[in-house]
Amino acid sequence: MASVRTCVVRSDQWRLMTFETTENDKVKKINEHIRSQTKVSVQDQILLLDSKILKPHRKLSSYGIDKETTIHLTLKVVKPSDEELPLFLVESKNEGQRHLLRVRRSSSVAQVKEMIESVTSVIPKKQVVNCNGKKLEDGKIMADYNIKSGSLLFLTTHCTGG
């Protein structure tokens, strides 16, 4: 059985975070715990053990951490740039026609739906848009969907009738 140890994560921006881990846990589990408390996406986190950057796919044991030791980590947050990213809108009708959209990570879903209306004539109310397997929801921003350059948006429309 894997021994349980305490992990303490400190950051300039948040209060001290403490939780339990085992040597078989991956660093990504710590990243996910931090995300649940801070809303900082895993891709925007850098965890440091002393000056060594921890890689999300590796187990804690691969860093030679003593079983009995409390792990003290430092969280750094990388602010992603807010430049315009080229995304491709794929329509479910019109033989999968593609449209290039230039979207910022800070763009609201409502703004993106207005862009979609300008190229497809489908009003936002009738649009169902998915990105990275998630339905875009009003009130959110595109950073919530982990968009990257070249990400695909899939457009379908609400059916009218029964």
UniProtKB/Swiss-Prot annotation:
The keyword Nucleus applies. Residues 3-78, 87-160 form the Ubiquitin-like domain. Its main location: nucleus. GO terms for biological process: aggresome assembly; myeloid dendritic cell differentiation; positive regulation of apoptotic process; positive regulation of canonical NF-kappaB signal transduction; protein modification by small protein conjugation; protein ubiquitination; regulation of mitotic cell cycle phase transition; response to tumor necrosis factor. Can be acetylated. GO terms for cellular component: aggresome; cytoplasm; fibrillar center; nucleoplasm; nucleus. GO terms for molecular function: proteasome binding. Mostly expressed in thymus and intestine. The keyword Acetylation applies. Keywords: Acetylation, Cytoplasm, Nucleus, Repeat, Ubl conjugation pathway. Induction: Rapidly degraded by the proteasome. Cell-cycle regulation with highest expression during the S-phase (at protein level). Over expressed in hepatocytes by drug injury (e.g. DDC; diethyl 1,4-dihydro-2,4,6-trimethyl-3,5-pyridinedicarboxylate). Inducible by the pro-inflammatory cytokines tumor necrosis factor-alpha (TNFa) and interferon-gamma (IFNg). Disruption phenotype: Spontaneous sporadic apoptotic death. Higher sensitivity toward endotoxin challenge. Abrogated TNF-alpha-induced NF-kappa-B activation and reduced induction of NF-kappa-B-regulated genes. Impaired TNF-alpha-induced I-kappa-B-alpha degradation and nuclear translocation of p65 in RTECs. Reduced expression of LMP2. Ubiquitin-like protein modifier which can be covalently attached to target proteins and subsequently leads to their degradation by the 26S proteasome, in a NUB1-dependent manner. Conjugation to the target protein is activated by UBA6 via adenylation of its C-terminal glycine. Probably functions as a survival factor. Promotes the expression of the proteasome subunit beta type-9 (PSMB9/LMP2). Regulates TNF-alpha-induced and LPS-mediated activation of the central mediator of innate immunity NF-kappa-B by promoting TNF-alpha-mediated proteasomal degradation of ubiquitinated-I-kappa-B-alpha. Belongs to the ubiquitin D family. This is Ubiquitin D. It comes from Mus musculus.
